[in-house]
Amino acid sequence: MKTRIDLTVEPRETGKHNSRGLRTSRNVPAVIYGAVTPTNVSVGEKEIVKYNTRAYENALFNLKSSDKTANGIVVLIKSVDVHPLTRRPQHVDFFALDLKKAVRVNVEVRLEGKAIGLSEGGLLNVVLRSVEVECLPTEIPEFFTADISNLAVGDALHVSDIKVSGSVKMITGAEQTIAVVNAQEEEVAAAPAAAAAPAAAAPAAKAPAAKK
């Protein structure tokens, strides 16, 4: 079963003044929505900075709170708004889950190996870095791996090459390309025809007319 991380949240009052006070005390305004009635809470800034990374992108959090409506809810961190200059978190959206109902999430695709096409002069073009899947919250994959070792020039890896199991259902189209090895185009500078050909001789000047 997917591990859950305990995260403490506390009830909060709404309004700009209250939100500003929370941020001053190094807490972040947040809202819980989804499988529950929307609930306003606050969460420690330090915790959000820690968990707002790719490593915890689809992590399940078990909320701990003095507010009975929030305590025990299992959530995903759906989004974090950050200040454009200080990069401090300003607001958090928590998505509450029903553990018995499937949810759609994006899962990172990690490429493994070195494509043989690179030694043939090809260039690797990564088209998709994540795919969308639907599954039970407890079966959300941490990431997918895709081996590109056998890709020669002109070969491609598609979504259909990713293997899924359990309740996981691929939503991204099977025909979509994840990575492809393209041939490296050679630039040939063609010399202008005028420069390649000898200049045409100028016509001879007419002799002056004889004086009578």
Swiss-Prot record:
UniProt entry keywords in alphabetical sequence: Ribonucleoprotein, Ribosomal protein, RNA-binding, rRNA-binding
Biased composition annotated in UniProt, kind: Basic and acidic residues: 1-16
Keyword Ribosomal protein: yes
GO molecular function, one term: structural constituent of ribosome
InterPro entries given in the database record: Rbsml_bL25/Gln-tRNA_synth_N (IPR020056), Ribosomal_bL25/Gln-tRNA_synth (IPR011035), Ribosomal_bL25_b-dom (IPR020057), Ribosomal_bL25_C (IPR037121), Ribosomal_bL25_long (IPR001021), Ribosomal_L25_dom (IPR029751), Ribosomal_uL5_bac-type (IPR020930)
GO cellular component: cytosolic large ribosomal subunit
GO BP of this protein: translation
The keyword Transmembrane helix is assigned to this record: no
Pfam families (UniProt xref): Ribosomal_L25p, Ribosomal_TL5_C
Subunit structure: Part of the 50S ribosomal subunit; part of the 5S rRNA/L5/L18/L25 subcomplex. Contacts the 5S rRNA. Binds to the 5S rRNA independently of L5 and L18.
PANTHER family per record: RIBOSOMAL PROTEIN L25/GLN-TRNA SYNTHETASE, ANTI-CODON-BINDING DOMAIN-CONTAINING PROTEIN (PTHR33284), RIBOSOMAL PROTEIN L25_GLN-TRNA SYNTHETASE, ANTI-CODON-BINDING DOMAIN-CONTAINING PROTEIN (PTHR33284:SF1)
Family as reported in the entry's similarity comment: Belongs to the bacterial ribosomal protein bL25 family. CTC subfamily.
Name assigned to this protein: Large ribosomal subunit protein bL25
Protein source organism: Bdellovibrio bacteriovorus (strain ATCC 15356 / DSM 50701 / NCIMB 9529 / HD100)
